[in-house]
Every structure is written in C-alpha cells, then in structure tokens.
Amino acid sequence: MTLDDLKSNSMKDQPDEKSNGDKAEGPRSLSTLRWRPAALILGLLCLGLLVTVILLIIQLSQVSDLLKQQKVKLTHQEDILEGQALAQRQAEKSSQESQRELTEMIETLAHKLDEKSKKLMELQQQNLNLQKALEKAANFSGPCPQDWLWHEENCYKFSSGPFSWEKSRENCLSLDAQLLKINSTDDLEFIQQTIAHSSFPFWMGLSLRKPNNSWLWEDGTPLMPHLFRLQGAASQMYPSGTCAYIHRGIVFAENCILNAFSICQKRANLLRAQ
C-alpha cells in the first residue's frame, strides 16, 4: 500500500466539515423563516395601533375643541339668558310700579269724581231750590207797591218835590201813607243809608206842637230822645210851624213853609208776602 493510498483513505475517513456545517445551520434557518411572518404581522399590528392611537388623539383633540366651542356657546347663551332674565325682572318690577301708580291714580280720580258728583248734586239741589224760589217770586206781588222800598214792617217812598211840609203831608195821605216816622235806631240807620248819597233834605212826619211845644209824630206819639237829637231851631215856634227834616243823616228843625223833598211811609202787607 502506497503513501498516496494512505492519504486517499485518510481523506475518505475525515468527515465533511462543510456538510456538517450546512446540517447545523439548517434548523436555525427554518426557525428564522417561521418567525418572520409573525414579526411582520406584529409590526403591522403595532403600526395599526399606532395609527389608531394617532387617529384617536386627533379625534379627541377635535372633540375637545368642539367641546370648548360648545362651552363658549353655552356660556354666551347663559349670559344672554341671564341678561334676558334680568331685563324681564326689571320689566316686571317696572310693570308692578306702573300698576301701583295707575291704581293710586285711579283711586285718586275716583275720589275726585265722587267729590265732583257730590258737588254736582249740591249744585243741582241749589238750582232746584233757586227755580222754586224764582217760581215763588214770579207769583209774589210783594208786601209793598211798585216803586216803594220795603224794610221790615214798613214801606217807604221818596216822593218828588220839593214842597212845603203841609203839601208833602197831603201827598203822602193821597198815597194812603204818612210822612216818615222813626220808631227805632234800625229804622234811622236804614233811612240814613238810603239817602247817604243824596244832597237834598227830606221832610219827616215830626213837628213842634202847641200848647206844650212838644215834638210829636203825626200819630200823636212823642219823640223818643234816645233816637236822635234835633239840630237847628229845635225850640223855636215859627208862625207857619216848626217841622223836622233829615239831611245827610242828621235831623234838623226848620220853618214848615220851606220846600223840601219828602219820605212817605206805610205799613207793609206782610200777609201778602207770605
């Protein structure tokens, strides 16, 4: 056996390292090939989850923005509603005040109307009374004749003239009267007021009589000293007589022959006045 044969045999007896190496690497290659699809799927799933998370974050951001906008709108609406409520409360308060003022005004007007109604009724009653008085006056001829003045129980007429005392007395008699007689201070005041604006003297029914030289009225009654005091020739007896006249409220004694106006007097017809 030669050396070449020994080398050839020894080379045949050595294991094939390449073959063994290939055999060792074979299982690992198969394992790697098996995990690659799973890793790919897992990566895809992670990518999908990442995309989903990103989308969710975007949607949440959008929802958050939308919620913020809605909150702003709601806040604005609340402000508007609060303003409207405040305006409504103010309007109600103003309406209540206006209603109260209107009620007070109505009550005041009603009170005034009631007073006016009472006043109107009083005026109507006064008008009715006046109409009755006018009707009564229309049927009333009066206690004194026409052109005579009525005072208490007597009628007075300021006659034309002037005439002497005697002529004046006759004129009064023709009128169914007598010359003026003063019975009281009230009568004197009435005559004084009536002739206050006259500058003429007026004969009275008072004269100085004999035998006692007393001042007597035409009906024979004496002069009452407290009524008035005679001025002038109160104690002088003239041939034609001494008579009294009134001038500007003062009574004078003078000659009966002198001319003056006169005041006639007679009783008033009080029964006819009733």
UniProtKB/Swiss-Prot annotation:
Localization terms from the record: Cell membrane; Membrane raft; Secreted
Domain C-type lectin: 151-265
Residues carrying lipid (S-palmitoyl cysteine): 46
Pfam families: Lectin_C
Coiled coil: 89-142
Function: Receptor that mediates the recognition, internalization and degradation of oxidatively modified low density lipoprotein (oxLDL) by vascular endothelial cells. OxLDL is a marker of atherosclerosis that induces vascular endothelial cell activation and dysfunction, resulting in pro-inflammatory responses, pro-oxidative conditions and apoptosis.
Protein name: Oxidized low-density lipoprotein receptor 1
Organism of provenance: Sus scrofa
Organism placement in taxonomy: Eukaryota, Metazoa, Chordata, Craniata, Vertebrata
Record gene name: OLR1
